[in-house]
Amino acid sequence: MLNEFPIFDYEDIQLIPNKCVIKSRAEADTSVTLGNHTFKLPVVPANMQTILDENVAEQLAKGGYFYIMHRFDEAGRIPFIKRMHNQGLIASISVGVKDYEYDFVRQLKTDAPEYITIDIAHGHADSVISMIQHIKKELPDTFVIAGNVGTPEAVRELENAGADATKVGIGPGKVCITKVKTGFGTGGWQLAALRWCVKAARKPIIADGGIRTHGDIAKSIRFGASMIMIGSLFAGHIESPGKTIEVDGEQFKEYYGSASQYQKGAYKNVEGKRILLPAKGHLQDTLTEMEQDLQSAISYAGGRQVADLKHVDYVIVKNSIWNGDASH
């Protein structure tokens, strides 16, 4: 039962250092393998319209990073797969569970993407299970990611249906208001939910949401994530598709949730909101900084590679590390 587990989130945890065994953090290997491909970092930008478009997806793939294209340009998905494959790049797309998506999946047989993410706010659903089974039947070589979920039962069911990885996180994101609108979710205890779900998993888990700092990436790996999906830290870059807005002479970028009225174009079943983020520099600068910070984390863990972070000890500090020092 969940009540037997300690409940905590990212800011409540500090990892405990081990003796360093490498001469320089540059020796630390941050690469991870998901399915048949290896990527430079265990992170993936959230598949949201204000985070990535086709150009950003292409930039990420060319750089050796994992990406998941959002599902909000439905007609553009097949041309996108062709565009990527024509350049020798992997194609990674998202689908929903509506009836017409079944026909869409059948159309992919001639040029199947390497990765498909079934992208639903509440992924522990019969509709998701039947879509997993459909994709696995039609495209047996495609790696299927399914989500989002927040319980071990959900992880087990989606894995048993054929999912190759599950995405854990119900509403912990910065622009997600599921917890406010519905009373449900993993907001405020996302890291504990990840730990709980990992115990049931036989396949990779993608932690999705609640990442506020680069150190949270290392913490996610410690608690069992194979890959970490990140929204707000990847939003607001020069390349980001969000609108640039000027307020009192300062540049901001628009960032909104996937179930917001801004994305839906209608105010119904809204579980996302819009915020403005100060405009950042280039996306590659953030990726490089994430890589360097993760290399430092691996060196603190006394390791040489990402998996070594899984074995460090930790302490639950309940917010004390941030007290009086919001600058971090």
Swiss-Prot record:
Cellular component aspect of the GO annotation: cytosol; GMP reductase complex
SMART domains: IMPDH
Documented EC number(s): 1.7.1.7
PROSITE patterns: IMP_DH_GMP_RED
Catalytic activity: IMP + NH4(+) + NADP(+) = GMP + NADPH + 2 H(+)
UniProt keyword terms in alphabetical order: NADP, Oxidoreductase
Entry annotation: catalytic residues: 176
General function of this protein: Catalyzes the irreversible NADPH-dependent deamination of GMP to IMP. It functions in the conversion of nucleobase, nucleoside and nucleotide derivatives of G to A nucleotides, and in maintaining the intracellular balance of A and G nucleotides.
Classification via PANTHER family: GMP REDUCTASE
Protein's name in the database: GMP reductase
